[in-house]
Regions:
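Bacterial Sec-dependent N-terminal signal peptides
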Residues: 1-21
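Extracellular glycan-recognition regions
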Residues: 20-217
């Protein structure tokens, strides 16, 4: 009984949450203009930048802004996103990245005058999936949950009800960069806003299962 109680306490203590301090994060492809106030980042997204590898279009680009912190283990990351999207493929979202050949990005992408919930998953080559929205939205929350060797991506319009938009593989037991990404492949730039970015550590699922299996030993 005491060991089962200890397992419960361990799990609760491990699920710590809090806003990630934006001032302690790192830029990859730092934009010329941005502003951080509290837990809000407003970015002037530069034009003609993107993340994509090979498939369909035949080119590789890795030159868009990404503001991140590095995390190991299992976690839940969440952020509120809005943007003044202007031209085709303007986008803002959450990015999880191991290296230039292994990453995902998920958020809002503006395509042919419509808002889309967009996810690109890359393992050497990129794929792209979208959920078309029937109306413009002022903002969206994107949440990513990393468990074992998978990442689940969810969206919400009220930060209460979340719907899954993608489940994909990502190498486990490997530190990843988690943060805020934008892209503007076709245009001259736009303004994007990120609010309330937070990462909650989750107790390692394999360790919890081991503890339960050995609770009476």
């Amino acid at each position: 009984m005491k060991k089962l109680l200890a397992i419960t306490v361990f799990a609760v203590m491990a699920m710590t949450a809090g806003a990630q301090s934006l001032n302690k994060m790192t830029w990859f492809n730092e934009p010329a203009s941005y502003d951080i106030k509290g837990n809000t980042l407003v970015m002037d997204v530069p034009g003609h930048c993107d993340y994509w590898r090979i498939s369909h279009y035949g080119f590789t680009v890795d030159d868009a802004p990404f503001y991140y912190a590095t995390y190991g283990g299992e976690f839940e990351a969440k952020v509120k996103i809005s943007g003044d999207y202007k031209v085709r493929f303007d986008q803002a979202g959450l990015m999880i990245r191991i290296d230039k050949e292994n990453w995902l990005k998920a958020g809002i992408e503006y395509v042919d005058g419509k808002y889309n919930l967009s996810t690109v998953v890359t393992h050497h080559t990129s794929d792209w999936s979208v959920i078309a929205l029937n109306r413009p939205v002022d903002h969206v929350w994107i949440k990513a949950v990393r468990r074992l060797d998978a990442i689940e991506i969810f969206y919400s319009f009220d930060d209460k009800t979340y719907t899954m938009m993608r489940n994909c593989w990502m190498q486990d037991n490997t530190p990843v960069q988690v943060g805020l990404a934008t892209a503007c492949p076709d245009g001259e730039g736009f303004k994007a806003k990120f609010e309330g970015f937070q990462v909650k550590h989750l107790p390692d699922q394999r360790r919890l299962e081991w503890l339960k299996a050995h609770a009476d030993n």
